[in-house]
């Protein structure tokens, strides 16, 4: 099946580095699920707010890769909606990003697997799971 980014995803993609845009476009071609780009670049203030809200485990908001356009957040878009609890769908899209990065020779790190163990369950146990986060290394 062929998917296409919508206006909001394109707007978010336009804020990040070209390498990350390429990877996201290739991942969309490879993914078994449609997905949306929830966020590209963000400010230090937005990062600080995410920390305050408990949606970021960073201690220093200036360390976010989103600030420099080196990160995006995606979410699978299935049957017309995002199911934030469908961790298997997030993992499947993460695998598409992983394959896209390999094909394009672009190194990535994933919030679903910070330690590159090949499993997201350990990230959940540590409280560091960020399933839709992809960043350039």
Swiss-Prot record:
InterPro entries to which the protein is assigned, alphabetical: Hedgehog_sig/DD-Pept_Zn-bd_sf
Alphabetic keyword roster: Antimicrobial, Bacteriolytic enzyme, Cell wall biogenesis/degradation, Cytolysis, Early protein, Host cell lysis by virus, Hydrolase, Metal-binding, Viral release from host cell, Zinc
Taxonomic placement: Viruses, Duplodnaviria, Heunggongvirae, Uroviricota, Caudoviricetes
Gene3D superfamilies according to UniProt: 3.30.1380.10
Gene responsible for this protein: lys
Name of the protein described by the UniProt record: L-alanyl-D-glutamate peptidase
TM region(s), chain numbering: none
Function: Endolysin with L-alanyl-D-glutamate peptidase activity that degrades host peptidoglycans and participates with the holin in the sequential events which lead to the programmed host cell lysis releasing the mature viral particles. Once the holin has permeabilized the host cell membrane, the endolysin can reach the periplasm and break down the peptidoglycan layer by hydrolyzing the link between L-alanine and D-glutamate residues.
Enzyme class: hydrolase
Record's note on what induces expression: Expressed in the early phase of the viral replicative cycle.
pH dependence of function: Optimum pH is 8.5.
Any one GO molecular-function label of the UniProt entry: peptidase activity
